[in-house]
Amino acid sequence: MPVARSWVCRKTYVTPRRPFEKSRLDQELKLIGEYGLRNKREVWRVKFTLAKIRKAARELLTLDEKDPRRLFEGNALLRRLVRIGVLDEGKMKLDYILGLKIEDFLERRLQTQVFKLGLAKSIHHARVLIRQRHIRVRKQVVNIPSFIVRLDSQKHIDFSLRSPYGGGRPGRVKRKNAKKGQGGAGAGDDEEED
């Protein structure tokens, strides 16, 4: 007998109020092209995350500066944003959170970082490499293009050890050509002996 499961989940994005606003459509399309996103939902998801962070910062700014909640939660929020590389260490104030843009978060995606490091020929190639499990962060293979790369993990992005790009087993075509090369050389020797 099947067991009924209740999934606890919430929406990770909010659709725009005005569906056909030309300026917004153009801006979203530009972001999709620049950062190699799959669809508008990926833009909306980042926008939603940014909105939640800014809302938290605005709420904390309404409290008194010496308020323990503002000190504790404000520092936690700032540290988190600095750790993922969205905010500079010199700008560790709540006011700077309100000035963050979507591009700041899109720059920290694994897909963008792989392209910027020169591991991929284009932003779209970076997405393919990640999905095909060729990229690792530290020792962990990551196959999610939207993975947010922390500042300390940025220098540890590299090809997977099992990937043909990273010195692992050669790919299908390379193996086929190598086999053909060995077989061709062996066949040529036999003909000369006869």
Curated annotation (Swiss-Prot):
Q: Which residues carry this modification: Phosphoserine?
A: S153, S163
Annotated SUPFAM superfamilies: Alpha-L RNA-binding motif
Compartments reported by the entry: Cytoplasm; Nucleus, Nucleolus
Q: Which UniProt keywords apply?
A: Acetylation, Cytoplasm, Isopeptide bond, Nucleus, Phosphoprotein, Ribonucleoprotein, Ribosomal protein, RNA-binding, rRNA-binding, Ubl conjugation
Per the record, what is one GO cellular component? cytosolic ribosome
Q: Which residues cross the membrane?
A: none
Annotated positions of the N6-acetyllysine modification? K66, K116, K155
Q: Where is this region: Disordered?
A: 162-194
Q: Where is the S4 RNA-binding domain?
A: 108-182
Q: Where are the residues linked by the Glycyl lysine isopeptide (Lys-Gly) (interchain with G-Cter in SUMO2) cross-link?
A: K93, K139
Q: Which domain of life is it from?
A: Eukaryota
Q: Cite the GO molecular-function annotations of the record.
A: RNA binding; rRNA binding; structural constituent of ribosome; translation regulator activity
Q: Name one GO biological process term.
A: translation
InterPro entries in UniProt:
Ribosomal_uS4, Ribosomal_uS4_CS, Ribosomal_uS4_euk/arc, Ribosomal_uS4_N, S4_RNA-bd, S4_RNA-bd_sf
Q: What protein family is recorded?
A: Belongs to the universal ribosomal protein uS4 family.
Q: What's this chain's function?
A: Component of the small ribosomal subunit. The ribosome is a large ribonucleoprotein complex responsible for the synthesis of proteins in the cell. Part of the small subunit (SSU) processome, first precursor of the small eukaryotic ribosomal subunit. During the assembly of the SSU processome in the nucleolus, many ribosome biogenesis factors, an RNA chaperone and ribosomal proteins associate with the nascent pre-rRNA and work in concert to generate RNA folding, modifications, rearrangements and cleavage as well as targeted degradation of pre-ribosomal RNA by the RNA exosome.
Q: How does it assemble?
A: Component of the small ribosomal subunit. Identified in a IGF2BP1-dependent mRNP granule complex containing untranslated mRNAs. Part of the small subunit (SSU) processome, composed of more than 70 proteins and the RNA chaperone small nucleolar RNA (snoRNA) U3.
Record protein name field: Small ribosomal subunit protein uS4
Task: State the organism named in the record.
Answer: Homo sapiens (Human)
